[in-house]
């Protein structure tokens, strides 16, 4: 028998974006072919999709770690990398997606509804896409962004029309087994039912879904017994059925006190709910009372004696049944179908399935200077933190082994206004500035126009000294005259220094 799993924690890692390519077009008789490096492919997304063939979260219980494929790197001749294949995870209808803080992100109630649980990283731009008037043939490309990585909680709330509630051993499992094709475990001891059971009840040509949850006891809304874990399965039900054991011999218990105790637990659970199901609060939903075990003579006598009192006190319809003898079930079925049909008419019409997407907020150029802030670094006296989505993404895209790429990053940060704000915040040349996970020694940069003469892959602004030293001029002259070999530095300390400077 398959286990019913209604809560799991998923560890998700979407695919990383592919890196852009650095390439220069080479063709006969075309000496200035220009850059032709392609862009990297988008990383694969992780998507949750509601499937009618799935009824539990069991698969995720055994395989909670999920990783999507990465995008392919770009290539020369303007060839973009392939997009990483999206990974689709099928979930049952009624799945609620929460983040690690317990905040609801999506409620998947309709077959075919999709939710992008983790977005893949954007592919990096190739040098062809980075060409500009200042950089006609960039010698660098952008790295792909990493895919989103986080944990999500999936909770399953049954999409049943009728919910059976009652004390342990009240006969709920027996009742659902004779009213539907469900085959729950049945025993003559408390808490036989350890997981919710669902069954489809047929009434003529009409059907409705019934849910049997584990028995509730006083304090269930506070975590006692098994009730707290399974009360979520009655949140979406249109009608609640109190199944009362009229044959119970427990001291201090009677049908009316059982109903009052269960109503108190439902009211306490309702106060913790913040979801609008369109059905109203639990305390306002229709109720039906089922006095069970009428096959026992004493129980039948007690049920007939209390039936009028219960109807008068609570105002709910009361049915006397025997699940074992299968007596009194048809009137109960028709009454439940009538209430369910009325509730379905009142329920708001479901919208067409829509994809709910978790992704970085769109960038609005008009708010460019409001998209980051400068803070004092609490762990580094005299240091500064640049906090913002856009600069942190740029850090991830930068290849720090390439000076030209670093210079491009500096230009982007300056254009965003980071340098101006750092200067106003008191940053000085040499101050340590941290963006994302990278720390720099801040030095104000000149305009990107000055880099036009830089060889590919370099940025003259990053050189320690733009002037050629006397030793370098002397050595270049000796090489031209053939007095020394270009790679012959000789021996000794002076030669070592010249080798390092050259």
UniProtKB/Swiss-Prot annotation:
SUPFAM superfamilies: Obg GTP-binding protein C-terminal domain (SSF102741), Obg GTP-binding protein N-terminal domain (SSF82051), P-loop containing nucleoside triphosphate hydrolases (SSF52540). The keyword Acyltransferase does not apply. HAMAP family: GTPase_Obg (MF_01454). Monomer. Residues 2-159 form the Obg domain. GO terms for biological process: ribosome biogenesis. Its main location: cytoplasm. Belongs to the TRAFAC class OBG-HflX-like GTPase superfamily. OBG GTPase family. This is GTPase Obg. Its cofactor is Mg(2+). It comes from Corynebacterium efficiens (strain DSM 44549 / YS-314 / AJ 12310 / JCM 11189 / NBRC 100395). Residues 160-341 form the OBG-type G domain.
